[in-house]
């Protein structure tokens, strides 16, 4: 199977009212809500035009969301069916649209077990990305999915998706092919990296 981009997804941060375990109301700002776009999108060093992140603080020397090492988030379409087969509550009670997990690119043909840290991906005609690390899901995923503690399920099974930095800026659109330009077989896969991080 040829690896390719199925959807390009962007969104701006939005404020949500949520309730904690004590029924106290809180306002949470999140950028997890992404929607597919029909047009091509320019990808710069900081991410996709028209996309935004809510929490860009630096914690323990890593930016929570955004930044050059988390400029583009890829999520494999194959995981959608796996989640739907395991869950029928919350958001999984209805079919999910691409971008549901907050990804910028919904992709097919490769996943965390076949992608290595440092892999260089050529996307479409000119965009070049380099894989940096797996997603570390936060509590806002629980809100999106409407299942308490769902982020821990993502951690346990390793269906995290992964972030990339932008090596060469360029356009991306649905249907673009993704080619492996460089890969170091001694580097850990995204899944291995994720499992070590949890250990």
Would you name each region that the model predicts?
Residues 1-124, 128-137, 186, 190-194, ...:
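Electropositive, beta-rich accessory/interaction domains or terminal extensions
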Residues 115-168:
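Glycine-rich active-site loops that engage anionic ligands at enzyme catalytic sites
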Residues 162-199:
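Well-ordered alpha/beta subsegment
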């Amino acid at each position: 199977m040829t690896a390719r981009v199925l959807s390009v997804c962007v969104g701006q941060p939005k404020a949500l009212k949520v309730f904690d375990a004590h029924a106290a109301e809180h306002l949470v700002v999140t950028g997890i809500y992404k929607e597919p776009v029909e047009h091509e999108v320019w990808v710069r060093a900081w991410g996709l035009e028209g996309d935004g992140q809510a929490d860009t603080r630096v914690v323990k020397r890593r930016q929570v969301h955004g930044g050059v090492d988390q400029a583009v988030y890829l999520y494999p379409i194959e995981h959608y069916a796996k989640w739907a087969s395991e869950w029928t509550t919350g958001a999984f009670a209805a079919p999910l649209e691409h971008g549901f997990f907050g990804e910028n690119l919904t992709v097919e043909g490769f996943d965390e077990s076949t992608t290595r840290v440092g892999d260089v991906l050529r996307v479409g005609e000119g965009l070049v990305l380099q894989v940096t690390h797996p997603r570390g899901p936060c509590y806002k995923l629980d809100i999106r999915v409407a299942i308490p503690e769902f982020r821990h399920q993502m951690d346990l099974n390793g269906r995290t998706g992964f972030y990339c930095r932008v090596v060469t800026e360029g356009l991306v659109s649905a249907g673009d092919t993704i080619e492996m330009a460089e890969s170091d077989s001694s580097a850990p896969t995204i899944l291995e990296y994720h499992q070590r991080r949890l250990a």
